Amino acid sequence: MVETNSPPAGYTLKRSPSDLGEQQQPPRQISRSPGNTAAYHLTTAMLLNSQQCGYLGQRLQSVLQQQHAQHQQSQSQTPSSDDGSQSGVTILEEERRGGAAAASLFTIDSILGSRQQGGGTAPSQGSHISSNGNQNGLTSNGISLGLKRSGAESPASPNSNSSSSAAASPIRPQRVPAMLQHPGLHLGHLAAAAASGFAASPSDFLVAYPNFYPNYMHAAAVAHVAAAQMQAHVSGAAAGLSGHGHHPHHPHGHPHHPHLGAHHHGQHHLSHLGHGPPPKRKRRHRTIFTEEQLEQLEATFDKTHYPDVVLREQLALKVDLKEERVEVWFKNRRAKWRKQKREEQERLRKLQEEQCGSTTNGTTNSSSGTTSSTGNGSLTVKCPGSDHYSAQLVHIKSDANGYSDADESSDLEVA
């Protein structure tokens, strides 16, 4: 037997209305909560509870309130049918469009762009939202999330941002000067660098950072800072004493402050310590003459004590020396010659005094000398060797080169 659903010929099927069909179906009640609420409700709560993202939470909450106002406006404008099916479909479509619009508004570009454009109106919107935040409660999966922010925590006021940032920032020590970050730095610059980094005193740096340098360098740094402080103290005391008529740079003018002389010595030592070793004195170069060169020079000196430039240049070519060296040699040789002559004159004078020493007793000896009387009654004693001494003096003074002590009074120079 084959069963078919088609009616036999001549008969028609007629469905009688049921009891449920006759009764009017009540309109379906559809919840008007926004679609996909679990995602951004929780995100909004997290952003609002975060201290660093207060503006983003306010922005999201304002978007949700705008959507709620749009839903209420569309509900008042859309007519409902008898069975309520058309209105329910319209509401669902509006909810989907609102969810898509909200998702498009949650992008980073849209949020940051609106922040840059509406930077001036952000505080007023934030205050309005924070005032209405206590009345609006957002529900998600049966859990009520109350969004409450007090006036002290609201980021709309600039004072709260400054206070929160000040509270969140940790207390840090004073910054170390850049020139002290190298342990190999010379200790001479330690006092100035520590004074620039710490306003109280240079020793504050060593107290705050005891392990900044190794042991030996730390001890040297402490000693140098102490010396710098002592120097500043002494300079201040000297400046105070300068008002009483004493000069601060003369230690002899302060009999009650004997440490000022030691201060100058220590200051000189510190200057050498800070700027390295003192500059060395330039050593003068000495020319060592050979025997042949000395013979040529002595022969020329016997002829003349003052050779001209042409003669010095010719002599320099002969002895293979510079003309400046030859000039210096002649200058030194003349000084040596003057010294020898002075010694000879002194020796002859002493010899004459010894020969004439016997006449000082007032007695005259005819064998040792002759006595002559003058018209004024004075006696003149003439020693026998006085003529020879006078002749030697005349020979010394009468130089063939015309030399005199007044011509050149310089000492010996290095050739």
UniProtKB/Swiss-Prot annotation:
Q: Where in the cell is it found?
A: Nucleus
SMART domains for the chain: HOX (SM00389)
Originating organism: Drosophila melanogaster
Q: Where is this region: Disordered?
A: 1-37, 66-87, 114-171, 238-284, 336-383
- Record's InterPro entries? Goosecoid-like_HB, HD, Homeobox_CS, Homeodomain-like_sf
* PROSITE patterns given in the database record: HOMEOBOX_1, HOMEOBOX_2
Cross-referenced Gene3D superfamilies? Homeodomain-like (1.10.10.60)
Please explain the role this protein plays, according to its UniProt record. Answer: Appears to regulate regional development of specific tissues. Can rescue axis polarity in UV-radiated Xenopus embryos.
Name used for this protein in its record: Homeobox protein goosecoid
Gene giving rise to this polypeptide: Gsc
